[in-house]
Amino acid sequence: MKRISILGVTGSIGTQTLDVLRFHKEDFELVGITANRNIELTMDIIKEFSPKYVAINHEESYKKLVDLVKSQGLKCEVIYGMEGLVKVATLDEIDIVVTSVVGMIGLKPTVEAIRKGKDIALANKETLVVAGELVMREAKENGVKILPVDSEHSAIFQSLQGNAHNKIDKILLTASGGPFRGFTIEDLKSVTPERALKHPKWNMGQKISIDSSTLMNKGLEVIEAHWLFDCPYKDIEVVVHPQSIIHSMVQYTDGAVIAQLGVPDMKLPIQYALNYPNRQGNISEKLDLFKIRELTFEKPDLDTFKCLKLAYEAGEKGKLMPTILNGANEVCVELFLNKKITYLQIPEIIEECMNTFDYNKEVTLHNVINLDKEVRQYIYEKYN
């Protein structure tokens, strides 16, 4: 039996991970969980899965959960804040950590888990974006497997199995194109948060839905792929594939292209990461090739969707530039959702930050966290 901690258990990836655990009850034990504000769902999870440790990152929610757990006689330790996240990620009794929290908050617990020798099922792409050099070095030194949960990176990971890494010609990273595929800049001027949250293929949280609409999500995935697969940016090509059936591909030097296909369901890559190197029974609808009318492919429009272009630039510059990109994007998405800035201001402000801050420093946990704070403070003071 594999023992698991889930960081961000009440979010989209976290709840779908629970679906996988329900489907394979005999194979997994949920030992630790973390959450933020959704105490009602957290209580339901505690009652169903009986985790020993629960970390809450929101102070009022933490106090509320402590009272509920005590009043109902539930046997779990409730811990507060970043200290709690790190504890849940580094428990002696766990084998693997599912990092499904959104944003920079996932960095420290992920790094500490790696240092404790825990395998990582990685859904928190920001960790590799801002500190890929550090994370991959620590993983290598500690003999830890980084198993991608993103559908695209899982597809690449699977397409690489049994093939020589030095024979890769390019990685073909697929993108649905988001809800505004084919839009012009003029069309994007009137985009509201409500429209941007409606993704055509995937059911996701708010932040990743906005990122998918701007193509920043794909940009972050380009940087993530660079670190996961040690692939130069010039050899990572984004391919818009609206049907979202091919989750990504690898083209080899002999011209062969190996792809992973499946229905758009995050439970598939979650299950693969948790069971690697084995494959488990089918948890999702199987792909019916006869129902697929067509598979189409387009080049992304980098002039209209500038976030993808900025991500490539940040990745190429390296050092702490991806930290600036990521921190600026997180704040811009928050301000856009709160209707403080317009949709087209998102890439404008990100580019402004990339031109403002010094990125040419060593990638350490300290430097990443400090620069991230500076970038956020700058945007809040100027635009909030």
From Swiss-Prot:
Keywords: Isoprene biosynthesis, Manganese, Metal-binding, NADP, Oxidoreductase
GO MF, any single term: 1-deoxy-D-xylulose-5-phosphate reductoisomerase activity
Disulfide bonds: none
Binding residues for 1-deoxy-D-xylulose 5-phosphate: 125, 151-152, 176, 199, 212, 217-218, 221
Pathway the protein takes part in: Isoprenoid biosynthesis; isopentenyl diphosphate biosynthesis via DXP pathway; isopentenyl diphosphate from 1-deoxy-D-xylulose 5-phosphate: step 1/6
Protein's GO biological process: isopentenyl diphosphate biosynthetic process, methylerythritol 4-phosphate pathway involved in terpenoid biosynthetic process
Binding residues annotated for NADPH, in chain numbering: 10-13, 37-38, 124, 126, 205
Cofactor(s) the protein requires to work: Mg(2+); Mn(2+)
Protein family membership: Belongs to the DXR family.
Protein name in the entry: 1-deoxy-D-xylulose 5-phosphate reductoisomerase
Native organism: Clostridium perfringens (strain ATCC 13124 / DSM 756 / JCM 1290 / NCIMB 6125 / NCTC 8237 / Type A)
Encoding gene (name): dxr
